[in-house]
């Protein structure tokens, strides 16, 4: 069975410079992605300041995003503050059997989590494990968080079970990438994708394998956002760029078509 995946750091649903709400633009953008499963980072499920500016509404930010065609969702709170909270989320067209959020914060200045959910591509199909994460800004924090993920995969997920690990890894030095590949046996979706853009091919020597540049969205240079797989095959992957996407977030979304089995 083929699935389309996407990962996207949505910058809390506001523009990077002026803090203008972009939820409805993001909803339309998610609809255009046409992904079966979307991994989101920096999702504000509650924001009283934004609610006051936008007027009375019964819909939470996650309600708005889910209305782009996703009947199933999971949300994990990472950071709580007086006017709201934010975290990671998974939107899915496939029913989510269960989910749990795991705190992987490394210090008091950053609240980080790994959201784990389980879906099945079809009745009777093996469980497909989804992990959505947003790693820390400090290298040592990221390395410890990668170690936590590696341990979780070893302890909690059967060796033959298919896994998708996606999110914003903040790994501009690529240490996390090397560890996840070496310890967990994961592959990144761009490993098997041939570069069509000559500039991308020219710069590929600066990054391990085929990691794609996603940040900043206005002129992507750093390879922060990724989709790692185990037990799935990649049929295509791309970064969506351009002015319209740059207006939605400071990250560019990453999309991959994969096959289970």
Predicted ranges, named:
Residues 1-37, 68-261:
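Active-site regions of metal-assisted phosphoester/phosphodiester hydrolases
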Residues 44-46, 171-172:
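Short "lid" loop at the C-terminus of a central beta-strand within the Rossmann-like core
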Residues 46-49, 82-84:
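Short active-site-adjacent helix-start/loop capping segments
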Residues 61, 65-68:
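Phosphate-coordination/substrate-recognition cap region in phosphate-metabolizing enzymes
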Residues 38-42:
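Acidic beta-strand-to-loop metal/phosphate-binding motif
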Residues 15-20, 47-59:
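Short, flexible/disordered intra-domain loops and linkers
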């Amino acid at each position: 069975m083929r699935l389309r995946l996407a990962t996207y750091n949505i910058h809390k649903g506001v523009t990077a410079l002026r803090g203008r709400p972009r939820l409805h633009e993001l909803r339309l953008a998610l609809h255009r992605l046409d992904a079966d499963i979307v991994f989101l980072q920096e999702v504000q499920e509650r924001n009283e300041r934004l609610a006051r500016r936008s007027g009375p509404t019964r819909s939470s930010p996650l309600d708005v995003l889910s209305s782009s065609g996703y009947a199933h969702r999971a949300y994990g709170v990472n950071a709580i503050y007086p006017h709201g909270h934010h975290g990671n989320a998974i939107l899915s067209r496939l029913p989510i059997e269960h989910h749990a959020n795991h705190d992987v914060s490394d210090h008091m200045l950053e609240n980080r989590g790994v959201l784990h959910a389980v879906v099945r591509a079809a009745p009777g199909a093996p469980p497909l494990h989804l992990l959505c994460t947003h790693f820390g800004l400090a290298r040592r924090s990221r390395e410890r968080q990668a170690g936590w993920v590696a341990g979780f995969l070893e302890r909690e997920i059967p060796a033959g079970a298919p896994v998708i690990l996606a999110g914003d890894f903040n790994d501009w030095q690529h240490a996390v990438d090397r560890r996840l590949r070496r310890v967990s046996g994961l592959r990144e979706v761009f490993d098997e994708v041939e570069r069509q853009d000559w500039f991308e091919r020219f710069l590929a020597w600066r990054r391990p394998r085929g990691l794609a540049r996603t940040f900043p969205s206005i002129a992507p240079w750093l390879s922060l956002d990724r989709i790692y797989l185990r037990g799935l095959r990649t049929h295509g992957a791309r970064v969506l760029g351009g002015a319209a996407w740059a207006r939605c977030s400071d990250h560019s979304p990453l999309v991959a078509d994969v096959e289970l089995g």
